[in-house]
Amino acid sequence: DNGGDAPLGGPADYGSSAPLRGKKGSEYEGGVRVPFIAAWAKPDAKNKFQKKYPIAQNAVQLQQGTVMDLYPTILSVAHVKSPKHYALDGADLKKLLQGKEDKNHRDDFLMHFPHGEHRANYFTTYRKGDWKLIYYYNPETTGVPTWKLYNLKDDPYEASEVSAKYPEKTASMIELMKKRL
């Protein structure tokens, strides 16, 4: 979950997610990117669930998933339908867990934090492919620009903000973020 409490800090002082920038709950990759490890506790080729829902062994999946994908995945494994009129934000991870590419799986991610008394800043992040856009709701109080753009392929540590260098990409990401909101 991206770090526990720092040993000398208060209850909301989380440890480092180094080498990524940010910490738990922040707008940066260190606040949201977490490795997910999945395996059957005891691989058994005869087990009916494992036959129907195999998990690739010793594989690394590069397509992203979110915690919202776990509920639909568990429903699928258990062969249970979601309750009627219950909106699902996530998607079944079956193909990804098999080590396959899922062309239908979303390649974007939205994290929306425009509220909360515990926050020092309010933001929305939108990630699509290698690009990530951050919107700050109160830039005048935090001293940061309203928009920040990062190319995570070239700069996974979010050290170089590139919105001025890529104004067209910034504009297109803003429109995509608005559509998701």
Regions of interest found by a model, annotated:
Residues 2-3:
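Active-site metal-binding loops of divalent metal-dependent hydrolases
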Residues 6-29, 46-48, 53-59, 63, ...:
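C-terminal cap/loop subdomain of S1 sulfatases and analogous C-terminal strand-loop tails that border
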Residues 36-38:
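Short glycine- and hydrophobic/aromatic-rich loop-to-beta-strand nucleating segment
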Residues 155:
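Intrinsically disordered, low-complexity polar regions and short flexible loop motifs
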Residues 160-168:
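Active-site-proximal N-terminal segment of extracellular/periplasmic enzymes that hydrolyze or transfer
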Residues 171-181:
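Short, intrinsically disordered, charge-balanced linker/junction segments flanking boundaries
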